[in-house]
Amino acid sequence: MLIPSKLSRPVRLDHTVVRERLLAKLSGANNFRLALVTSPAGYGKTTLVSQWAAGKNELGWYSLDEGDNQQERFASYLIAAIQQATGGHCSTSEAMAQKRQYASLTSLFAQLFIELAQWHRPLYLVIDDYHLITNPVIHDAMRFFLRHQPENFTLVVLSRNLPQLGIANLRVRDQLLEIGSQQLAFNHQEAKQFFDRRLSSPIEAAESSRMCDDVAGWATALQLIALSARQNHTSAHHSARRLAGINASHLSDYLVDEVLDNVDVSTRHFLLKSAILRSMNDALIVRVTGEENGQMRLEEIERQGLFLQRMDDTGEWFSYHPSFGSFLRQRCQWELAAELSEIHRAAAESWMEQGFPSEAIHHALAAGDAQMLRDILLNHAWGLFNHSELALLEESLKALPWESLLENPRLVLLQAWLMQSQHRYSEVNTLLARAEQEIKGVMDGTLHAEFNALRAQVAINDGNPEEAERLAKLALDELPLAWFYSRIVATSVHGEVLHCKGDLSQSLSLMQQTEQMARHHDVWHYALWSLIQQSEIQFAQGFLQAAWETQERAFQLIKEQHLEQLPMHEFLVRIRAQLLWAWARLDEAEASARSGIAVLSTFQPQQQLQCLTLLVQCSLARGDLDNARSQLNRLENLLGNGRYHCDWISNADKVRVIYWQLTGDKKSAANWLRHTPKPAFANNHFLQGQWRNIARAQILLGEFEPAEIVLEELNENARSLRLMSDLNRNLLLLNQLYWQSGRKNDAQRVLLDALQLANRTGFISHFVIEGEAMAQQLRQLIQLNTLPEMEQHRAQRILREINQHHRHKFAHFDEGFVERLLNHPDVPELIRTSPLTQREWQVLGLIYSGYSNEQIAGELAVAATTIKTHIRNLYQKLGVAHRQDAVQHAQQLLKMMGYGV
């Protein structure tokens, strides 16, 4: 819940001096990216900008305090301020900020700018007191903000010092409007106007000018002169002499003498007590100061000119001028030390009554009241956790003694979930074990079940599925239905374990249950996770169309709940890329993989390993080995500089082994095979993939017998567990083994099985990646004209893909190749004496690649009759009568040139 006063522009008071000369300068602010107003405290920065902002409807205002160094809090208020300025135009960004569903501040701002691209009118955001920001992450994000904000957007920053926002760069590019303390200082005319409005008796212009010079135009000093003159009934000139040459460091002494010592005791206590509030309203004042009518007292203090300012148009919220508020808080610690804890307790209670637990925690911490802090956390901690107020919660829990946590074990559970969210898995188990050992009496069964649900999540994250399953089952046996969050966690973990064990149908059922529960209780990250798992399971079962449709539901959920910046979004686009790759939609697959990398742009580079693997896969399917090698260099660098889950390594190894196969790099394959782990089982698609990598390397090295043993066992497991996509992949690799070992009939048999299974999976690229050996077999099958219609159609499609992406290596008779061929000493004499034209060589290459006459005509963009003429001519020159003879002739030429066909 946001405090309204932090988003309200200060109210313009009637007795303030209108700074016409500075307003004229600010009138051109829309021509600059940044308008920067800097000066020490008390020079009128806020007053000036509030005058300039008057009448501007499309302007947001954000008043900072020390608590805004929390990234999540900063983001929520900044987006809310822009929402006020735009009338709710940026709803997606607002939802992401409120639910903390963004990867970083920069990624949230990137989404904001996408929405603001549709906003075409001038727009302003004022950030007041930016000097309070000390968090370097926020500084970095605001530099990003300034670099990328729309041209019609102006950021206005008020600060006591030069902020770390890349000011020099903006200044050089003439994108910075600056107003500093020298310009903010009152001139003689403004000082005269000021005193005329504040003093009951007018003073001469010369005296006003002299006093202005004495304090160097410092607005706070002028205000103190007027206040002192009114309170003490002395001349303004006397006060001016006391203030001459004073600076902020000596201001405290002056404020004690001239302000605090000149108000009655009741007002003095009111000022000191109320100053602990960063913002205040009637209810807070009544509780903190004991005054019966807080609103009336605030208005009275305002009329006395005691540095109190309204923060909204309704006059409900107030705050002290920052310098005066800081001074009062310091005096409060000295003068009311014995009462200070009680004052903070009263503030915490009032904030709680108004529904602001974060502010209440701030005061409970300041009061050092562990019991109050505990009570606030017991009632509101889980809400704060779900809104990612993690830093505040961690600070609060550290402030509680361990004994207090033991007396309230749900707070121990909260601390453990905080550790889990930070991937501190070993600490989670240590904490829970210690708590169970030291909690006095019999531990509540439901709480124990919640502990087990969390432990189950930690176990599966840490790669221990057996322990995860045991704990998840224990949790589900004991958790009441009302404990929905822990039940969602335990059900999800159980489903994931069954996925790892190869029990796909039961795993799918549990993930569907998880989705239903998560949607019902608005636990959106688990709803998304369950959809991703369902899609993976359906892919493994060979139901790729069903997997596609599940992914569509996941994308819709991301859009509806603004989950675009969760790391899980990368998981979804990655499995979409895998599916697109399988269907040979390579451009779309590559785009999806790159969008996954973009989602992870603010994370460590190691997190991008899976998407980078897919980019290599796309290059390999296209036959672009140079690009694949470049990407592999980066991939192998990441592998050497991080620790990864076994399935991540298996996926990375897959593209490495395929690359070695395509380049004939037996040395690398042999070295890898010596060191790679050999899993004990192959009962899920992760382990199947690793064993398939091993078999592929063995085939490359000519180790056909051990490779066949591996593949036959993989097929047996895949059939029993219904891992149909893995079975399809295994059959293709077994086909290559039979083909290379000369067992042509066996090769044809398993290829027919693979083609039939592909009717279900839709696989294309898995065939294409095997290159010319696959193309030769498919040509033979097509020419036999015995394939069923669907298999015939798929075989032709695969041949076209191989021809498109691999023709340059095998079947593309370009000019350079033909020139080398004609100069070869073993070239047939018939070709040397009756050479083919360049077009006839192209036609021969396409015939060899399995193209029909119509397809050749389409490829070369000529009439079918022209193709028939070319074919008749090249048959005559080659001395052949039939198409199959031409294919065999082309194959002999390629072999002669050293191509392994």
Curated annotation (Swiss-Prot):
Subunit relationships: Monomer in solution. Oligomerizes to an active state in the presence of the positive effectors ATP and maltotriose.
Name under which the protein is recorded: HTH-type transcriptional regulator MalT
Keywords in alphabetical order: Activator, ATP-binding, Carbohydrate metabolism, DNA-binding, Nucleotide-binding, Transcription, Transcription regulation
GO molecular function, a single term: DNA binding
Xref: PROSITE patterns: HTH_LUXR_1 (PS00622), HTH_LUXR_2 (PS50043)
GO BP field: positive regulation of carbohydrate metabolic process; positive regulation of DNA-templated transcription
Cited function: Positively regulates the transcription of the maltose regulon whose gene products are responsible for uptake and catabolism of malto-oligosaccharides. Specifically binds to the promoter region of its target genes, recognizing a short DNA motif called the MalT box.
Transcription keyword on record: yes
Activity regulation behaviour: Activated by ATP and maltotriose, which are both required for DNA binding.
Pfam family, one: GerE
